């Protein structure tokens, strides 16, 4: 997976994703094997993202490294790998948890997210991300600090 930084972390749509990918210079991206100028479009797959307007299916681009043969999905920084819940909603859930607020507020703002999604996000946060963020002195807010 290769994360593409976007300033607008709340905007997720197929047209926005396509415009970001279209504007990318693939030869400037680096593979995890440390080679650059070696990635080419390999294919696409469908991925569901749960937004407040409803769940949408994105067509996500995959690239392949000509040096090591690895394939990578190109994800926007507003998307969390292996999750249907956008980064901004996950951040809000964790912040509400840390501030002892009602965790269902995010569910009300984004009806696509249910209580099981919230429990799963909090389990991952408590077991893994909370200590990593603290040890690296990365604050939970503002959102830009999480993705830089």
What are these regions (language model features)?
Residues 69-148:
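Short, positively charged, Gly/Tyr-enriched micro-motifs
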């Amino acid at each position: 997976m290769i994360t593409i930084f976007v300033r607008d972390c709340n905007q997720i749509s197929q047209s926005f994703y396509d415009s970001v990918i279209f504007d990318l210079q693939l030869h400037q991206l680096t593979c995890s094997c440390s080679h650059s100028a070696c990635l080419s479009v390999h294919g696409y797959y469908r991925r569901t993202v749960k937004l407040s307007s409803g769940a949408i299916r994105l067509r996500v681009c995959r690239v392949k490294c000509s040096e090591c043969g690895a394939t990578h999905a190109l994800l926007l920084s507003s998307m969390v790998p292996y999750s249907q819940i956008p980064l901004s909603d996950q951040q809000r859930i964790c912040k509400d948890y840390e501030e002892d607020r009602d965790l269902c507020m995010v569910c009300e703002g984004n009806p696509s997210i249910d209580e099981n999604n919230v429990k799963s996000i909090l389990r991952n946060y408590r077991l893994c991300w909370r200590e990593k963020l603290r040890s690296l002195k990365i604050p939970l807010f503002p959102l830009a600090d999480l993705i830089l």
